[in-house]
Amino acid sequence: MRVILQKDVINLGDAGDLREVADGYARNFLFPKRLAVRANEGNTKAAFHQKKLGELKKEKRKKAMEAVATNLNGKEYDILVKTGGGEKLFGAVTPIDVASILKKNGFELDKRKIEIAEPIRNLGSYKIKIRLAEGIQPVITLHVKKEEE
């Protein structure tokens, strides 16, 4: 079945793309969540127009993300955490924690854009990649330090 994506769908495409998908996938997943509509002549013309507008918006957003990436790339941040015996943390440092540190420093980012390779459970310095947009991935350094009591 040919569908026009209404929103970006991971592993399928961006909003406005025309895609061929299995009938069941369209009826049971894409249509109920309003992620896509059936492709017919009228919808295709409207989608083509929307895609043009979307590309302009995407280009503006990409330029804005490049500016944010320039400001973020290479920056170093400290986080104070409680530890058990030695250098082991109580719990772990998560993308939510990193997002809150970045927010305090003027960068409001979605936690899903922050990539931590493996859970941070020890003190030390860690490189963290942030996926702002396709091809724009600044790397920050996070210094995990013991909270003084």
From Swiss-Prot:
Extract one GO cellular component term from the record.
ribosome
Which Gene3D superfamilies does its entry note? Ribosomal protein L9, C-terminal domain, Ribosomal protein L9, N-terminal domain
Keyword Ligase included in the entry's annotation: no
Sorted alphabetically, the keyword list is: Ribonucleoprotein, Ribosomal protein, RNA-binding, rRNA-binding
Q: Which InterPro entries match?
A: Ribosomal_bL9, Ribosomal_bL9/RNase_H1_N, Ribosomal_bL9_bac/chp, Ribosomal_bL9_C, Ribosomal_bL9_C_sf, Ribosomal_bL9_N, Ribosomal_bL9_N_sf
A biological process from GO: translation
Q: Name one GO molecular function term.
A: structural constituent of ribosome
In terms of Pfam families, this protein maps to:
Ribosomal_L9_C, Ribosomal_L9_N
Return the SUPFAM superfamilies for the record. L9 N-domain-like, Ribosomal protein L9 C-domain
Q: What does this protein do?
A: Binds to the 23S rRNA.
Q: Which NCBIfam families match?
A: L9 (TIGR00158)
* Family according to the record: Belongs to the bacterial ribosomal protein bL9 family.
Q: Which HAMAP family match?
A: Ribosomal_bL9
What name goes with this protein? Large ribosomal subunit protein bL9
Organism lineage: Bacteria, Pseudomonadati, Spirochaetota, Spirochaetia, Leptospirales
